[in-house]
From Swiss-Prot:
The Tat system comprises two distinct complexes: a TatABC complex, containing multiple copies of TatA, TatB and TatC subunits, and a separate TatA complex, containing only TatA subunits. Substrates initially bind to the TatABC complex, which probably triggers association of the separate TatA complex to form the active translocon. This is Sec-independent protein translocase protein TatB. The chain crosses the membrane at residues 2-22. It comes from Shewanella baltica (strain OS155 / ATCC BAA-1091). It comes from the Bacteria. Signal peptide: none annotated. GO terms for molecular function: protein transmembrane transporter activity.
Amino acid sequence: MFDGIGFMELLLIGVLGLVVLGPERLPVAVRSITSWIRAMKRMANSVKEELEQELKIEQLHADLKKAESKGLSNLSPELKESIEQLKQAAQSVNRPYQVQDPVKDTPAPENQIYSPVASTVQTSPAQASQANPTATVEASPAPASPATPSEPSQGADTRSNPKANG
């Protein structure tokens, strides 16, 4: 990385940094600079790996087109291998995105009887809870919350409550 910089130049940069930043801030500055350099190296390596992967895919596509133009009968072993790799890559890409429909997988009952929706029939709460367990929750009214003793209700007499008088 420092191909053109010798020891004397690095020593000069260190002394200038010590004079400009001081002994308290110099170690912090060196640590932050090295972390930035590491982050840039990681980013450059990831970009390089992605480009290599894309180039490999492009090479596989070129080999496949070459194989198609020659015909699939007289192929070299390299081309056969690259075709197999391309097929495996295509299968691995398509496999995670396949969604299995549970409705299609399970057979539908042929003689299923659907219950009609009856909104006009009056039932007792016991019958409703047997027919639909969620109906009792929906039909029961919410309990009224009583006012807490620390919070007087509107218009309540607060003379006997010392907390309410403040």
